[in-house]
UniProtKB/Swiss-Prot annotation:
NCBIfam families assigned: PRK00132.1
Family (UniProt): Belongs to the universal ribosomal protein uS9 family.
Family annotation (Gene3D superfamilies): 3.30.230.10
UniProt entry keywords in alphabetical sequence: Ribonucleoprotein, Ribosomal protein
Name of the protein in its database record: Small ribosomal subunit protein uS9
Cross-referenced HAMAP family: Ribosomal_uS9_B
Gene Ontology cellular component annotations, sorted alphabetically: cytosolic small ribosomal subunit
Ranges of biased composition (kind: Basic and acidic residues): 99-110
Region (Disordered) residue spans: 99-130
Natural source organism: Clostridium botulinum (strain Eklund 17B / Type B)
Length: 130
């Protein structure tokens, strides 16, 4: 018999997270490392666990994640998005609660491109009167 698992893909900035929810006791493993060793900052760990805490499913699923691209914040947001999508696959009645919290919406904000004639996306070269 196949093991029950729920898959979800999350994205944020340049990060892509492939999330699997497996019935378990609430262990979160990211790229074969525990969440405590992968994310040093407590705020990033809180972001990852938000959907599980909101729906009260923290102790019902083990979360297995493969994430690549981007930085820490983008990866945390991508994991949260992936966990949310997987939770909705596991139980459709959680959708309104997660939608209201804004976890189902893909954050569209991306890095603005650098324009020629400027130092960065908006930073102009220093102006000199003389």
């Amino acid at each position: 018999m196949a093991k029950v698992q729920y898959m979800g893909t999350g994205r944020r900035k340049k990060s892509v997270a492939r999330v699997r929810l497996v019935p378990g006791n609430g262990k979160v493993v990211i790229n074969k490392r525990e969440i405590e060793t992968f994310f040093g900052l407590e705020t990033l760990r809180v972001i990852v666990n938000q959907p599980l805490v909101l729906t009260g499913t923290k102790d019902k699923f083990d979360v297995l994640v493969n994430v690549h691209g981007g930085g820490f914040t983008g990866q945390a947001g991508a994991i949260r998005h992936g966990i949310t999508r997987a939770l909705v696959k596991s139980d459709e009645t959680l959708r309104p609660e997660l939608k209201k919290a804004g976890f189902l919406t893909r954050d569209p904000r991306m890095k603005e491109r650098k324009k020629y004639g400027l130092k960065k996306a908006r930073r102009a070269p220093q102006f000199s009167k003389r």
